[in-house]
Every structure is written in structure tokens, then in C-alpha cells.
Amino acid sequence: MNAYFDTSALVKLFAPQEAGGDLARAMWDSTDLAFTSRIAYVEARAALAAGSRSRRVAGTEQRAGRRALEGFFQAMDLIEVTPDIVRAAGDLAEAHGLRGYDAVHLASSLTLDLDDTVLVTWDRELAWAGYAAGLDLAGISLE
């Protein structure tokens, strides 16, 4: 199995206290290839910083999270944000009411020409759009 991790799933890999962290780790451990968009790095760093500012994440946890993020990023196959992905993301944002980075994640995941790729996300709107596009899902339940 191959997996595309959006940022909501990626954060759960290095923040085990987050709900869903066990499932995210199980998906990571069982995948042959793990993919994400290069923009996930910015989103994940922003999430860590926001957690620190709101005092939900201690400074030591933020630093540990940043180190873990670096490790996961080195182990993943990164999808670059190309002009074609940007155009496709714009179309997907309009069609599905997605936020900008979520549309980039969906467009990136759709570039993978692999039959057994699962979109791993805890973002409900992205999950619905991925489902509509025919992707298999893991993470958030659509029920």
C-alpha cells in the first residue's frame, strides 16, 4: 500500500497525544511509499508554532516535534508544487469548496498514478473531495 499524508495526518505522526495518532502511525508503518506535498512542511511548522503560542505545546515538545517532522520529511517522497498542480488545485478548490492548501494536497495526491494509494487525512472537507475524486481514504470517518 502507498499513502499520501496531508498535513493533518502528518502532524499526528509526531504528536502522539493528538486523537488519531495511533491510526496515523499504523498507516505510516504499513505503507510501502509515503507521499506528501512540499507545502506540508510549512503547514506543519505553522501548526507547531501555533500550539506553542497557545501553550498547548511546550517549548520542548515543539522542538521535539520539529525534529520528528524533519525525520518524516526525509523519509517521504515529496511532490513539488508545479504550475500544473496549482491549476488543478484551483479547479478543485472551486469544485469542492476547499481551502487553498487542501486543494494543493488533493491535486498532489491525484498526480500519483498508483492503484493502491490511500489519502490519509483528518480534514473532513478534503476527505469528502478525495472520496468524490475516487480516492481510498484513511483517517477521518465520513459517517
Predicted region positions:
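Short active-site oxyanion
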Residues: 1, 31-34, 75-77, 113-118
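Short, well-structured N-terminal submotif of metal-dependent ribonuclease cores
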Residues: 1-40, 51-64
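Acidic, PIN/NYN-like endoribonuclease modules and their adjacent C-terminal/linker elements
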Residues: 2, 106-107, 111-143
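Acidic catalytic patch
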Residues: 40, 67, 74-96, 103-107
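Helix-adjacent hinge/juxtasegments
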Residues: 49-81
